[in-house]
Each structure stands twice: as C-alpha cells, then as structure tokens.
C-alpha cells in the first residue's frame, strides 16, 4: 500500500496473507507475497494471478505485523486443501483475475477473526460504486519496487469511472472496478494483490473488489484495477464456496 497508514489491531479481521515457498531456500519461512479475504468458515477469496503459483502453500489469517509476535494479533496459519481458479483466466492477461482457496479445515471465528460480507443485496449488486471511497489493505510494497511491508497497511481510494480508467488501460471492461486519485499518491501496490477493496455500509464491510493490477503504483492518471466482485458472484464465487 502506497500513501497509507498502519492498520489498527482488529480493524480488518478477515485479512489473509498468502505464503509462498522459496524453492531456493526451502527451510526459510513463507514469503508473504499476496493478500486475500476470509469467506465463511474455510474459503479465501484472492486473485487468480496469486493462486496459480504452485509455490503457494499456506495462509495466515488476521495478522497485523507478519514479523512480530507482540503486536496483539492472534493469527491462525493454515494449509490449503485446494484452489479454484476462474476457468477463463489466462496468466499473461488480466481478465477474470479471481480465485478461491479452500483451506485444510474450518476457521473458528473470534473477536479477532471473522469473514467479510459479499455484496449480494440488490442495492450493492447493481451498484457501480462511483462516489464511494473504499478501503484497501495489505502487506504489499510501500512504493513501486520498494520493500514489502511487515505491518498491515490501509488506504482509501475513490472509485473511478470505467470510461476514465480505460484511458489508462485499454483492456478495462465491466468486470473490473478502478480506484485511485487523479494525482496518484495513494494506491495498492505489488504484494497487495488478491486483497480486498472494501466499503462500509452501516457498520458492516462488503468486499467490492479484489486487487488485480496497475501500472507501477500510485502514478497520476493510473488508478489501481480491481476485479469487480459483483460481476462474479453468481458465475463463480457462490458456486465455488459450495465446493
């Protein structure tokens, strides 16, 4: 996350870090290189471009600082039983960048760990979210080509009309949602991929996007691009959660 601030303990109890093997140093602890969000009991929603790697093998749920044990968080680390990648996703392209991980076992919810809601209600399902200022959170880079963050960071970015977003990225379609400021400065970045774009409604958070791609990070006129969750509810997400 670029231009954000450290998240407070318990702010995002559905945040998941995705851990990858480093094959060159197999004894090393996981490399936390993507994000995701907890769904009911044992599934994680993330980006296909994260899930597709064979080196992905573990998740850590509801951590705050990935390197410290004294941050007050009570994270759970768990293996992955199976991965469901959107059938139309192609690694060299950006479309249909969505996947669901099924965990080895059910996650017990607590004050620290709970799932984020899907935008299933009509008022959300048919919303393009223009005028909203959603949050994005992750352990990704603090600037383009900069270091990954050990601390969970958060930032708010305004939703941009797809027409405007198309000026930056020609392949933008209705199945994505773009967010960022005209002057840049605040954005998700590499390592935040798969994490949630979130809006509060009353006191409940809903996930409206999944971090997908962007040109570098936080550049003027180049918003971040997110997979639009409402576009995939019936065709992919809800059926995948039954598996």
Swiss-Prot record:
Pfam families: Trypsin (PF00089). Its EC number is 3.4.21.-. Disulfide bonds join 34-50, 165-178, 189-217. InterPro entries: Peptidase_S1_PA, Peptidase_S1_PA_chymotrypsin, Peptidase_S1A, Trypsin_dom, TRYPSIN_HIS, TRYPSIN_SER. One of its GO terms (molecular function) is serine-type endopeptidase activity. Keywords: Allergen, Disulfide bond, Hydrolase, Protease, Secreted, Serine protease. One of its GO terms (cellular component) is extracellular region. It is found in: Secreted. Expressed by the venom duct. The active site is at residues 49, 97, 193. It comes from the Eukaryota. Residues 1-243 form the Peptidase S1 domain. SUPFAM superfamilies: Trypsin-like serine proteases (SSF50494). GO terms for biological process: proteolysis. It is an enzyme of class 3 (hydrolase). Belongs to the peptidase S1 family. PANTHER family: ACROSIN-RELATED (PTHR24252), HYALIN (PTHR24252:SF7). This is Venom protease.
